[in-house]
Amino acid sequence: MGSMCIAMAPRTLLLLIGCQLALGFNEPLNVVSHLSDDWFLFGDSRSDCSYVENNGHPAFDWLDLPQELCHSGKISAKSGNSLFKSFHFTDWYNYTGEGDQVIFYEGVNFSPSHGFKCLAEGDNKRWMGNKARFYALVYKKMAYYRSLSFVNVSYSYGGKAKPTAICKDNTLTLNNPTFISKESNYVDYYYESDANFTLEGCDEFIVPLCVFNGHSRGSSSDPANKYYMDSQMYYNMDTGVFYGFNSTLDVGNTAQNPGLDLTCIYYALTPGNYKAVSLEYLLTIPSKAICLRKPKRFMPVQVVDSRWNNAKHSDNMTAVACQTPYCLFRNTSSGYNGSTHDVHHGGFHFRKLLSGLLYNVSCIAQQGAFFYNNVSSQWPVLGYGQCPTAANIEFIAPVCLYDPLPVILLGVLLGIAVLIIVFLLFYFMTDSGVRLHEA
């Protein structure tokens, strides 16, 4: 159909316009896809083929991922997990993958339905904010890097106090960052403490810097039973750069004054020697980091909406985190409705959305994927690849530069058509005048 439109364009501009507008040719597909075979997907149970194969779900009805991709080597997924959950907690999976075009379909396994709070009177909304900030940095950085993996971070602490698991609930225990207990020779938490850690082996490291966002009560060994304001920082000993912040809210961990919980900011740090410093309350040190390697030319990541069926409470933090130009968000117009296994897996519309992984496309854009690169009923917004209506599209942040040649050619054709029409009108008018004169 596209070849016919191009072949007929010199004969009539109207047919070309008809192909583009009236027929809606080459409309963007609401799928997640890729420009080449150099792609990778990070997922959870909806793309965890190993879980399906080991548990014998018939016809792979558990998955949203096309079954044909199960042994492609392009998937890193774990049932019941997510990048955020693995980054912060003891229940983790070693997500590892590499590709030019990176796709994320995970995140739902840490949501309001789990209701995680550090403390009894904590605030799950704080953790939703942490989740959004975490994914925002991951998405942005993976638009510039090929490889993502997890690494452990070792530290050196000069005191005698040991790590403490202060932040946990019935199912999850936080171990990133690591909390160092109060030294026994201090009667309260009003003292400065520090520890050294080294980041090496990656181009950049994503690490958390977290503080309790209010007034923290001291331990039972604190005779004054005081409240403390948390203050943490990281200091790059090679460059002299500080990263840090203090708690600012008037909240606590009591029924009368609830809301005390961890607020985390995420930094992409370069390799080097660092010092973690606490000016008051507990010293925290990163124990895990996301390792970013192999810089690449800019390529936006694609994120598929990760949510439960309406029977469970979901959040939209991955959508909040996925911002253009470095991230393109994919969603469906309907809720998640699972098929034969349960309501949370094997959703028809999400299977259709992920079916685009079975083939390459010419262009990915904000509206979706364009299969052809010649003409389209819609001009690609933030397009990347060989996009329709342009011979070449390159991203120079944040402006798309379109090749003007097709537009120039259309203008030339329009000019020629006008000249031909004028010539024919003049010819027939002259010919009619001659015939009338002869008659």
From Swiss-Prot:
The active site is at 45 (nucleophile), 342 (charge relay system), 345 (charge relay system). N-glycosylated in the host RER. Disulfide bonds join 49-70, 118-167, 202-291, 210-264, 322-327, 363-387. It comes from Puffinosis coronavirus (PV). Its main location: virion. Pfam families: Hema_esterase, Hema_HEFG. Residues 1-22 form the signal peptide. It is a single-pass type I membrane protein. The lineage of its organism: Viruses, Riboviria, Orthornavirae, Pisuviricota, Pisoniviricetes. It catalyses: N-acetyl-9-O-acetylneuraminate + H2O = N-acetylneuraminate + acetate + H(+); N-acetyl-4-O-acetylneuraminate + H2O = N-acetylneuraminate + acetate + H(+). InterPro entries: Capsid_hemagglutn, HEMA, Hemagglutn-estrase_core, Hemagglutn-estrase_hemagglutn. This is Hemagglutinin-esterase. Structural protein that makes short spikes at the surface of the virus. Contains receptor binding and receptor-destroying activities. Mediates de-O-acetylation of N-acetyl-4-O-acetylneuraminic acid, which is probably the receptor determinant recognized by the virus on the surface of erythrocytes and susceptible cells. This receptor-destroying activity is important for virus release as it probably helps preventing self-aggregation and ensures the efficient spread of the progeny virus from cell to cell. Homodimer; disulfide-linked. Forms a complex with the M protein in the pre-Golgi. Associates then with S-M complex to form a ternary complex S-M-HE. The gene is HE. Glycans are attached at residues 94, 152, 196, 246, 316, 331, 337, 360, 374. It is an enzyme of class 3 (hydrolase).
